[in-house]
Amino acid sequence: MVIKSALKLISDAYAPSVLTLSTFESGTRAEESTQRAAGVTRDKNVNPFISLYEDVLLPSEQWEDYGLVGISIVGISQILPGLTLARTLKEKYPHLHVTLGGPIFSVNAKQLLDHPEFFDEFCHSVVTFEGEEPLHRLLTALKQGTALKEVPNLLFCEDGKVTLNEERVELRFEELPAPTFEGLPMDLYLSPYPILPVLQSRGCYWGKCTFCTHSFVYGHRYGKQRTKQMVDELEGLAEKYQTKYFTFSDEAVSPHSLNDVSEEIIKRGLDMKSLALLKFEKVMDEQLFQKMRQAGFIFLMYGLE
């Protein structure tokens, strides 16, 4: 209640903006257009992040030591905080290459072709779809001074013209390294223990819902980790970060995967507590749920389509 009350006071000071533990709404519909967004990212009367970044974030790092900063914007409530950070860095540190990424841009990439002002205001480039290999190639291009047109999955602006590199590069799951959380201030998160996000799969094993954009973001492609690799990752992260709490951030974990991962966790005798997102399936029965509970799946969130 204390934190909620504090956020309510902050929201009142920046009305009509509303800030909660998980969302930010400006009350100006600025997320709907680049012009409105540009205005709100400069307006200290409604945007609490401007002062936060200028007073706390910028002095905390030696930005002159960096050559590139990547900002991932996943959901709508992150648009204004993310763009405010991008604009602030781009203005304060002209040597930085600011690149944006995340599902928001993958879905709306072609709309940015008609908005060169977006790049003037916020960033130098945008990585669309899966970003591991494009980001690596972007870093290489910047280091070697080669043309950005050779970087796949990239939007950029030159001489007032926005270009979208159509080439798509996607890695197989076995090519992806385990996640790392080095450098993150884990002790500052509002939880008694670190709760680490992991991915057992990318895309959706169903992938047929016409209202959903997740399959589009992954190119209507589905891939998943092998069971042993997944549990190896969980075990390694648990030991490295001294936690037993995990969130499976998949769009939906398949029943088959849940069964196999649960069996492997039980087999190894691991003590874990996990959250997972699921889709209702007829094959989900009491036996599966008992096995999942034994493996530490204590919080399940269902999508009902």
Walk through the language-model features, giving the residues of each:
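Glycine- and acidic
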Residues: 66-72, 122, 194-195, 214-220, ...
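Conserved SAM/AdoMet-binding glycine-rich loop
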Residues: 68, 95, 99, 231-305
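Extended, charge-rich helix/loop segments that form flexible
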Residues: 1-43
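Glycine-rich beta-alpha loop elements in corrinoid/cobalamin-binding modules
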Residues: 26-166
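Conserved, mostly hydrophobic/aromatic
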Residues: 154, 204, 230, 248
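Flexible loop/turn segments at secondary-structure boundaries
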Residues: 76-80, 106-108, 135-136, 163, ...
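Canonical Radical SAM [4Fe-4S] cluster-binding loop centered on the CxxxCxxC motif
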Residues: 191-228
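N-terminal [4Fe-4S]-dependent radical SAM core
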Residues: 42, 157-198
